[in-house]
């Protein structure tokens, strides 16, 4: 079962996350508000673990 996860990043980090999500074939939506990018990702447990590890490094 997939859950929605929300993340807010600056534009530089958002570009990096976007490339990572595309490489992992993870479904997401992104919207911009001034200098922040808001991501909504639909993840299962294993994908959520991967993204959390990536965000810790970022």
Spell out what each predicted region is.
Residues 1-38:
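N-terminal acidic leader/helix
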Residues 10-14, 42-50:
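Helix N-cap motif at beta-to-alpha junctions
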Residues 20-23, 50-58:
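Short amphipathic alpha-helices in soluble, non-transmembrane regions
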